[in-house]
């Protein structure tokens, strides 16, 4: 609940409680919050309102140290005795005691995931994404789909017309007059992927080709999935350029399961997980894929939807200490190669070159799954 009369107090940025905090621990301390100062430079008096009570409850469930919570509250302008009493009463409250029961169940589930992850990491070359050719249907299903392992297939596009025809200039010459949907102005929004509907724009494909090829490396614009390009009759020749598929894919379902990607070097798809399995083929250019096991979900701070706030390139370990020790699989997918994304694997993708890609979900296995996603916006 938000404060009724004053702004919600600043949320603490968690940091490890001690240098020897173990991986998987939920012990956090809040960092110092910025005080509101009056004209004399002293902390302005705040009321202990509903926003503060929720803040105390949140941090009790995070196992923050009471002294650390008290210091933050006093620095923000709360009376020390009132703040100390609020912390004490919260730890004894029936609501928090009930929440502790569910917390125990959650922590048991997290421990099961953590122990299973330890077993997975015993596999030789766990952190290496294999590059394979000649993978049979049976091996793909058992080793990679059901076995839940990413893999790069190097021979899928061997007979694809797209490999000799597609280029940005080809798109401009044959389809440049058509309008397509892109994502734009992404650089001004740290949550551009979560807010992707707000970044949709319609542009002429020819103009977008010029922008991509002439604008240098950037993440500001990108034609991403769900643009429906390959479902439109005008773009049927592109769909026909996708040649034979592996025998673990249903060719007849391709048209309704394929997405087209086109963007410059420098694009970044933030850390998230998909809700089904897919294949992603590079036709032009290269992309760098980083993968994190779905068993590591408790350690990537998935507070909202399918997204993680962690940037693998620059992880803020003071704010997200549980990410320390998470193993990241790293592979560059070259033109002509196809990466398999197993169910629920976290991934962050970076464009290394101007690239044209297609992704498709018509895998000949059950590929419709349900996730109960959190919708917490105030952590």
Task: Walk through the language-model features, giving the residues of each.
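Eukaryotic low-complexity, mixed-charge intrinsically disordered interaction/regulatory segments enriched
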Residues: 24-92
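N-terminal accessory scaffold of Fe(II)-dependent oxygenases
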Residues: 2-17, 23-27, 31, 81, ...
């Amino acid at each position: 609940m938000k404060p009724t009369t004053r702004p919600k107090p600043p949320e603490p940025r968690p940091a490890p409680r001690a240098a020897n905090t173990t991986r998987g621990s939920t012990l956090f301390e809040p960092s110092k919050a910025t005080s509101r100062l009056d004209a004399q430079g002293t902390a302005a008096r705040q009321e202990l309102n509903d926003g503060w009570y929720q803040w105390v409850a949140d941090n009790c469930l995070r196992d923050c140290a009471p002294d650390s919570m008290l210091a933050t509250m006093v620095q923000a302008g709360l009376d020390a005795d009132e703040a100390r009493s609020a912390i004490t009463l919260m730890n004894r409250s029936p609501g928090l005691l009930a929440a502790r029961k569910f917390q125990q169940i959650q922590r048991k589930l997290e421990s099961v995931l953590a122990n299973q992850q330890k077993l997975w990491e015993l596999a030789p070359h766990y952190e290496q994404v294999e590059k394979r050719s000649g993978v049979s249907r049976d091996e793909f299903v058992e080793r990679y789909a059901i076995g839940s392992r990413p893999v790069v297939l190097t021979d899928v596009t061997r007979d694809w017309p797209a490999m000799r025809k597609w280029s940005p200039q080809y798109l401009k010459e044959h389809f440049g007059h058509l309008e397509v949907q892109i994502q734009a102005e992404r650089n001004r929004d740290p949550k551009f992927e979560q807010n992707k509907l707000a970044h949709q724009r319609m542009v002429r494909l020819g103009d977008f080709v010029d922008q991509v090829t002439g604008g240098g490396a950037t993440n500001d614009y990108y034609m991403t999935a769900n643009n429906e390009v390959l479902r439109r009759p005008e773009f049927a020749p592109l769909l026909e350029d996708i040649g034979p598929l592996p025998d673990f894919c249903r060719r007849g379902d391709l048209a309704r399961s394929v997405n087209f990607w086109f963007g410059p070097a420098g694009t970044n798809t933030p850390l998230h997980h998909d809700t089904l399995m897919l294949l992603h083929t590079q036709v032009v250019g290269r992309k760098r894929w980083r993968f994190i096991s779905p068993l590591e979900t408790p350690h990537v701070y998935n507070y909202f939807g399918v997204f993680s706030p962690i940037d693998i390139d620059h992880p803020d370990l003071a704010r997200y200490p549980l990410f320390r020790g998470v193993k990241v699989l790293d592979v560059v997918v070259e033109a002509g190669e196809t990466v398999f994304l197993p169910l629920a694997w976290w991934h962050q993708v970076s464009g290394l070159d101007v690239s044209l890609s297609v992704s498709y979900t018509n895998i000949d296995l059950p590929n419709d799954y349900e996730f109960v996603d959190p919708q917490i916006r105030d952590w």
